[in-house]
Amino acid sequence: MHKYLTFILLLFCYACAENQSATTTNSNAYAQNFSIEKTAEGTVLAVKNPWPNSTLQYRYLLLSPNTQAPKDSSSYTQIIRKPLSRIVVTATPQVTALELLGQVEAIVGFPQPQFVSNANFRNSLEQNKIAAIGNNQQLDVERILQLKPDVFFGFGVSDNHNALEQLKKAGIPVLWIADWTERHPLGRAEWIRFFAPFFQKENLADSLFKTIASEYNSLQKQLDTLKTRPTVMAGAIYQDVWYLPGGGSYLGQLFKDAKADYLWKDTEITGSISSSAEQVLLKAQNADFWFAPAHYTSYPQLKNDGNLYQRFEAFAHQKIYTYNKSLGPSGGTLFFETGPYQPHLLLKDIVYWIHPGVIDAYTPYYFKPLDDE
């Protein structure tokens, strides 16, 4: 009897080991909104929080060309064959991720492509290899269907989108990209690992992200010895409301990691905060630095929009910085296009301006002071 029980126990342990080896989860270091699992059926990519306050989760099964699809696919949102060769993307950071992986040539469609700055993308556009597909609010479904993409990488604020339903019914897989809802700058950049399996570029993506994270964390550690934390404010007025990043937001995290005392750091808001100009003045009139003043790029612009802006110390001492330093050929702001996948440079820029002397021989790429005229 003892031998029989031992044999059963060994079989059970073996079965558990087999089951564990059949599924391997590639853990993320920072990203919260996607996961990758290697299973017996294939690579499973899960996406959650594709837009703020979403409770939905999507599961995509990625298969090799000759792999048979599972008989029961009810647990998957879509089944996709790799590697992809024809894709439609819908946001400029997605182009940057594909550029890093060397896969821009796979793009065949984009909404309002004239505003993309990436050189390889624009070269393909000039050769008519990339088609305009309307805009994100009104997609040209007929044109997308003509392109016959392997996958449509979506970006939006809800899944209530008639055009995307039409694509699904036509057999085109629609995948939601949630890099933009990540709170940590490195979390956004880590989404390069999500794109990689579609092109069998996992090793490259891991190497690229490791380098980005290493540079970011090394600079952050370098700042640990600083004894002062300059105060920082952000944002500007739009239609009588002052919009500024919440303490739990992407920019809020960058300010924190740059060892700045962001004056709204205690808020848990992950998006933007809506405030009155008077409240902002009361809280931040004496702030040392002012970042991301919306569309403003010069002091005369701020001055012409009323006297209130001039009452801030950052205005008086000319310590206001715009993210419009680097622009693309058509005027697109690279802060939005490439910044999400270059967080180490965003951090470096902020540190350069608020902690003079900490970084030597560096030219900021994204942030610059407002122009004098």
Predicted regions and their residues:
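Extracytoplasmic substrate-binding proteins
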Residues: 129, 150-153, 160-241, 265-266, ...
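Structural recognition of the beta-strand scaffold that forms the well-ordered cores
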Residues: 86-89, 106-110, 151-155, 174-177, ...
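A short, structured surface patch at a secondary-structure boundary
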Residues: 52-56, 60-145, 151-156
